[in-house]
């Protein structure tokens, strides 16, 4: 398992592992306000998420851990999060549970960021196999403020060592939510969450990380690994699979209303992407691959500089939309066109409510 974790990191660094599908942020326009009637200094990007304050609405999404070399990566990422006062998740902690010698590669995140928002991470297959006490163990491992329970059926199905049995997941998730005393987030890992899935869990979980198509595609990551091991790379057949991130945010929000926190991850690459994630109705954005590559290429300082520029872009976009708070972004007028418009029309999502209403209220409940 250690080597698999490192192979994942190497694939993400050196290979083209991004989805052939777009997150469809390019199909969203925030309507410009020539007269925003707002001082730039009065634009407040702070939010509270799972009981912790973030200086701006971004989480460094969980990526790695479980191999000795990944511990130093997580240490650097935690230092970035601490300096910027944003959230951070860890990669799947399955390896840390099975191998005590690599627990430190996860624990280092809380050591470096004692007061910040930290999300633990474990998969539904492991919770079904080991029971809800496993959730308690991974939360305790990083002294987490919230628990991300990831579902990655596509990745498991194409993975050499995968476990593609996805039966009974909703019941497992409900049992976990009753067991732990921190908020639980259902986390997709690159294929998105549909309205149908959101309906299954909206009365169970505290949040949904849509993990939409358009960013890192873990089926492709597994295809890279399969080729390296001389196996047929099945994952390439699913390089454009999934619900695009922009569509997933709207689908999930349509059925959960304002009852759950939504984290928009999947292909978030710029501050404008973050602004569109917020405008579509998410509470917060998540970014993984660009942060990983930046911290490895330029260290903590370079990564901090990069994310500060992201934050500046978001603040400018909020000013140009006439919004003094993140919450206001969900009700700014937007224009939706192209593939996203076609998706919404095919899925019966009312475009008038999407474009002119408060997208946090829900309309398909």
UniProtKB/Swiss-Prot annotation:
This is Isopentenyl-diphosphate delta-isomerase. Its main location: cytoplasm. It is found in: Cytoplasm. It comes from Methanopyrus kandleri (strain AV19 / DSM 6324 / JCM 9639 / NBRC 100938). Its EC number is 5.3.3.2. Homooctamer. Dimer of tetramers. The lineage of its organism: Archaea, Methanobacteriati, Methanobacteriota, Methanomada group, Methanopyri. Involved in the biosynthesis of isoprenoids. Catalyzes the 1,3-allylic rearrangement of the homoallylic substrate isopentenyl (IPP) to its allylic isomer, dimethylallyl diphosphate (DMAPP). One of its GO terms (biological process) is isoprenoid biosynthetic process. It comes from the Archaea.
């Amino acid at each position: 398992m250690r080597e698999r974790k490192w192979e994942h990191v190497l694939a993400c660094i050196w290979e083209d592992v991004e989805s052939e599908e777009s997150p469809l942020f390019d199909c969203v326009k925030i309507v410009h306000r020539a007269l925003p009637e707002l001082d730039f200094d009065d634009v407040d990007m702070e939010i509270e998420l799972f009981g912790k304050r973030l200086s701006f609405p971004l989480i460094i999404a969980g990526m790695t851990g479980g191999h000795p070399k990944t511990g130093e990566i997580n240490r650097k990422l935690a230092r970035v999060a601490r300096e910027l006062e944003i959230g951070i998740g860890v990669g799947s902690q399955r390896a840390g549970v099975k191998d005590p010698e690599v627990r430190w590669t996860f624990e280092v995140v809380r050591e470096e960021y004692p007061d910040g928002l930290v999300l633990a991470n474990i998969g539904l297959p492991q919770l079904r196999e080991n029971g809800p006490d496993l959730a308690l163990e991974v939360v305790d491992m990083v002294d987490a403020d919230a628990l991300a329970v990831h579902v990655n059926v596509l990745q498991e199905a194409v993975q050499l060592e995968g476990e593609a049995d996805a039966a009974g997941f909703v019941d497992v998730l409900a049992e976990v939510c009753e067991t732990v005393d921190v908020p639980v987030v259902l986390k997709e890992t690159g294929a998105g969450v549909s309205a149908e899935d959101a309906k299954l869990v909206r009365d169970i979980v505290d949040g949904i990380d849509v993990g939409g198509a358009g960013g890192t595609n873990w089926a492709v990551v597994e295809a890279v690994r399969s080729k390296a091991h001389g196996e047929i790379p099945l994952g390439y057949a699913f390089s454009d699979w999934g619900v695009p991130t922009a569509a997933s945010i709207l689908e999930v929000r349509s059925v959960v209303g304002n009852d759950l926190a939504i984290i928009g991850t999947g292909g978030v690459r710029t501050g404008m992407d973050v602004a569109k994630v917020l405008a579509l109705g998410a509470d917060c954005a998540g970014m993984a691959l660009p942060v990983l590559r930046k911290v490895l290429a330029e260290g903590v300082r370079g990564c901090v500089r990069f994310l500060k520029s992201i934050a500046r872009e978001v603040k400018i976009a909020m000013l140009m939309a006439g919004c003094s708070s993140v919450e206001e972004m969900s009700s700014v007028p937007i224009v939706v066109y192209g593939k996203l418009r076609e998706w919404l029309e095919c899925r019966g999502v009312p475009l008038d409510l999407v474009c002119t209403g408060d997208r946090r209220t829900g309309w398909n409940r």
